[in-house]
């Protein structure tokens, strides 16, 4: 049975007034505020709960509010064999976070130097010295520091020493199941797109550049636009009804995710026939 996938192909960015830092050198107006930390892959309902709780705290105390996230996603950094893992691209993540009207986004380069920081070093350097965070929001299963030895207990332990308060967001559940990026990735591989859309509170989409095909489809009456999946998690192979957004158009179509089934190709592609 066909499920609905929503691939979006467009260039615009929605970051707007959200300041993006690619290092941790914050301007004075963004220091000493409320910070939420996490991968935020998918920016799903669970993430949205963390963001909204942190945002309320910032408003209540008249403080700046920002998010710290990591690039690449640590799982992909530690295991180079994992190629297809993301729910959203980094650009999509920025755009989704910007919709919450946060003041700033810090994208930490997750590299060998950063991974070697102990949990206390992370708290001292990032939370205390660089951002001077007053209120820190994380989810219940947050792990950090070298070998992921840091936990919410570690955050609580160092609160007084480094002058912050950590607040733990309880997992959000739907149908008695925890909403997580891991569970959403699994549903994507199963092709359960409508379920995913409910957990994201929006239509899941794939964003990328159209790649030049061999135009063989055009010759047999089925012109297609091809999109590489890059490091997106691979949906269940098959045919989906889609909406396609380009720089100057928004149309419906039919997409096939597979290995060029007509011509025995080896590249995994999202091939879309756009109506009209």
Language-model segment annotations:
Residues 1-17:
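N-terminal amphipathic/basic-hydrophobic helices that include classical n-h-c signal peptides
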Residues 19-25, 106:
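Short acidic-hydrophobic, aromatic-tinged amphipathic segments that line or gate anion-handling sites
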Residues 25-84, 89:
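N-terminal catalytic cores of NTP/NDP-binding nucleotidyl/phosphoryl-transfer enzymes
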Residues 44, 97, 136, 196, ...:
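Residue-level signal for inorganic ion chemistry
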Residues 67-79, 84-127:
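Active-site-proximal cofactor/substrate-binding loop regions of enzyme domains
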Residues 116-223:
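Classical nucleotidyltransferase
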Residues 211-276:
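Phosphate/ribose-recognition catalytic cores of enzymes acting on nucleotide-derived substrates
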